[in-house]
Amino acid sequence: MAHTDGTAERPLGTVLVAGLGVSGAAAARVLLARGDDVLLTDAAEPAVLAELVAAGARWLGALSEPPEDVHLVVTSPGWRPDSPLLRTAAARGVEVIGEPELAWRLRIAAPGAEPAPWFAVTGTNGKTTTVTMLESVLLAAGRRAVAAGNVGRPLIEVVTARDADGTPAHDAIAVELSSFQLHWSSSIAPAGACVLNVADDHVDWHGSFDAYRDAKAQLLRLAPVAVADAGDPVASGLVGGHRHPVTVTLGEPERGQLGVRAGALVDRAFSAEPAGEVLVELDALQVRGPHNTVNALAAAALARVAGVDAAAVGRGLAGFRGGAHRNVLVGSVDGIDFVDDSKATNPHAAGASLAAYPRVVWIAGGLLKGADVDPLVAAVAPRLAGVVLLGRDREVLARSLARHAPTVPRTVVPSGDDGGVVTDGDSVMREVVAAAVRLARPGDTVLLAPAAASMDVFTDYAHRGRAFADAVRALG
């Protein structure tokens, strides 16, 4: 049971696994089970070290260059291309790949069959929602599907998993891939690929916006069908020259598109009917907002590539409930709704979230990572009832609000970045929510859509979202 070109059975020689988080540890386990010679490196000793060493791996501690006998480096997304270890490996001609590329090379298949196809999604925002929507649709169609990659389980675990009878455990994989993962991928050829959108993000890691965009485009290179949002100029431009482009639109779909007609999602890309085929009524979807309609259309497009009929697409999308910290209503108090979109970690995502509500008290701030917030603030100013700012880069947002929304009331909540004021994230969020309540009136939405990363005050975006929900519940 191997990948049809035999890669899954060939020894890889000595492999250095750089970074032992969830995906790195999973890669090391699979390599050890194959009998490969596995070396381990990381900045600090990981929790899984004893397990991996007991299985036969060798721990080398922190490295600035690979040992001379290394044939392959498998790196984790947190390792930048300009890190000394990876730069030295490249200079020596040692191949560097990520865990998804390793998974593609090592995927298994039943005798005489192809490995399970990948239906892959990337983009600045909406990846996780689209991939989990796609998983829901594939499961509704009776496929043995799973969401994996940058969401859920590591791909290397999924593509090598077997049922009790030894056959592959999955017959379709909904794959989320980040730009970091795609940077280290060269041969991944999904059956269908989607670039949802491309906005200014992660430029610090990639070095430039062009490099970031090109990493996203890598996903489309070997895919027979390429999907993008027609409303995103960069993403739609990437599929424009593809041999089989499909776009999704919030408007009436043309031939080759999926879109919206008379309150329903309609397929005019894969349906043989001249007018297209209705997939699902918009009112049947449990996730709201134009951005989620685009996500649903993209998931539907990839499901159609997988051969899923319209009825199953409709069932899968209607049954999808959405993920945590992604536009989730966490409570209503005195006629004010409180919505957690802590996953909106950049301006593009925050803009999509804000567009779903007519009058908003916006909770924003954190680590902007150099992103330009002026276009966002200018676009959303008319719907702002007030703004509460927190986090390290709150003053950047405050200056933008002064330029583009000078009449909107705003409150700045101090945090541990204020030299001498040391508070934990949960107490900061309680102050933030209290300030938002003072700015809101019945009918407003208090929206946590920070447009920034969370690690200045919180452990991660999930911690930020939980702190918000806890603070709302404490209002009574």
What does each model-found stretch correspond to?
Residues 1-106, 288, 475:
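N-terminal leader/targeting and accessory segments in enzymes
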Residues 3-4, 8-14, 25-34, 279-385, ...:
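Nucleotide phosphate-binding/pyrophosphate-handling subdomain across enzymes
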Residues 21, 44, 151, 231-232, ...:
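Residues in the short beta-alpha loop(s) of Rossmann-like NAD(P)-binding domains
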Residues 31, 73, 121, 150, ...:
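Residue-level signal for inorganic ion chemistry
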Residues 32, 68, 77-230, 234-244, ...:
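Phosphate-binding loop of NTP-binding sites
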Residues 36-43, 227-230, 363-364, 383-393:
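Short internal beta-strands
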Residues 42, 61-63, 97-102, 146-149, ...:
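Beta-strand->loop->alpha-helix junctions that form or flank phosphate-binding loops
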Residues 50-57, 376-444:
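C-terminal helical cap/extension that packs against the catalytic core
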